[in-house]
Amino acid sequence: MYLELQKRLGSRLRGLLEEKYGLLVENIPLEIPPDLKFGELATPIAFELARKLRKAPRIIAQEIVSALNGLEGFAGFEVAGAGYINARLDRAAGVRLVVGGESLARASSGLHSLVEHTSINPNKAAHIGHLRNAILGDTFVRLLRAAGQKVDVQNYIDNTGVQVADVVVGFLHLEGLPAAEVRQLLEELKGKGERIDYYCWDLYARTSQWYEQGTAEENEARKELRYATLHEIEHGGNETAEVAEVISTAVLRRHLETMLRLDIEYDFLPRESEILHLRFWEAAFEQLKQTGVLYFETEGKNQGCWVMTRPATAGRPGAETTEGAFDEDAKVIVRSNGTVTYVGKDIAYHLWKFGLLGKDFGYKPFFTYPERETYPKHECWISAEHGDEPHPHFGGAQAIYNVIDSRQSDPQANVIQALRGMGYTAQADHYTHFGYEMVALTPRCAVEMGYDVSEEDLTRPYIEVSGRKGFGVKADDLIDKLIAATRAEVDARQTGGADAESGRQRIAEQIAIGALRYFMLKFTRNSVIAFDFKDALSFEGETGPYIQYAVVRARNIFRKGGTTPEAALAEFAGADAGAYLTGEAGEDIWALWLRAARRTLVLEQCIATSEPAYLAKHAFQLAQEFNNFYHKHHILTEEDPARKTFLLATAAVSLRELIEVLSWLGIESPEAM
């Protein structure tokens, strides 16, 4: 409702300014005042027009207000202060709009977006930092789909990188296991109910330490072994590459199973190995040379390298300096030994994402997702050199969002720069690096996870984790511990009755996953998160369980009243709510209706800023205002039938909106808690 009325007012103002002053103003600034005493919408447009019209802002505001009256959905307009225009809504009409509800299933926008998230190296178990990436990405996918966009969800798999090489070194040289015995180990672990990703977690830490535990000569030889292993994996067709394929594929399956616990799914898994073997880089290299984005450096520290011009160098070395000078700060894309840097391969990959490469992957089905409430049954595909036919089409997107931590901002900027240099301006403009900061642990959380914490670390606000050092929180361990803690709370409340074992377990899982997802989403992306069990699982304050409990509380109203939200709204349809929206009590209820009406407004804000935290905050504020309403008004014992109908409708709208915004956050709404 808020978004609809905001657009209505903006359109009327644009027309009025053109008609009255001959001005074409595309973007009309509209704000939500901090207090209802100033109305429900406001605009400072008069201040922006003062210089052009050579009038005082207040005079302009008065002229505009005199021509605005009679706009449907608005009770009136007034000038405030030095020239603000405050708009007051027709409250009864606003309630009718909210009851009708802006469509929960938005019409297709026609925009095809691609979101890449998670992208865990397939060399060990997922950890808590990976969860922030996956939850951010999955939530943003839900937001884009809620806005009517077609969204492909991709999870990039670097199965030929140095992290995989480290684990392969561990299997081949620390444990002495050739490919056949690695396969046998996988079967043995499966038979014992043990996990390959956990096994690799420990082996990766051991290998990382092994590189540094010998003499200087031994460590240098081990370093050479590491890069020789990496080269063999990249080249393919040998036993080293076979071990890498077996391990990375097995670990990848475990990652998908871990993420499924959080209701996170993918459509396509593009792998680094196919980008190499299908020669994506060679196709991109030709385009980069032809467009002048790359040049061959013949002098200086980058002699013998293919380097990318910076924006100011206009496609050739020395363009911004004296004749014959070379650009020491140019970005190396192909090293003097012929190897391609990470950025080079990433440029090729993103040309494919936009459908600009002229090459494609082969595709094979890899992982079947079961049918669930949130998603239909569907297949996740993986890249291959020679795929199956028919297959879905991936790539060719109009907009790209890469959920990659903030430390990768420079490489991401280089890819955007390359696209722009090649003339793909529209694609560069629709390439978003969805950056975020790290996840650490509070000292209390580290102790609860069983780690030895020094006296000094106990005084720190947070403790950083390191998979290379073996100090970190595995994602599944974290989820298991959250569920166990929640189950204890659910059992104490005897939710569902003493014999409802499966019901209580299901509720515990819903609360635990909701707590985790909300904790990861409530902080803005540029904030470091210090994870803490007690804070995440609290039923009070800005937490997932607090919002879920508001849903349960609303459902209980209808359960005890012997009715349903749908029936309450149907009974209220057509009634005049104006009489119940005045006075102090009426103001509070109207504020709740207004909060409920912000859903699509917040959705647009989240997408425009690539910031899901706005929706998390909205969900909390809606739950908070509903709880205040619940405590102030005795809905089921209200003696006035008409007022009771209105209060039930208020609860029904609050419940509907809470369930919807929680679903956009990937959080389920329990029936009981």
Residue spans for each PLM region:
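Short, charged, solvent-exposed linker or helix-capping segments at domain edges/interfaces
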Residues: 96-102
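Non-catalytic interaction-recognition regions
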Residues: 1-95, 107-673
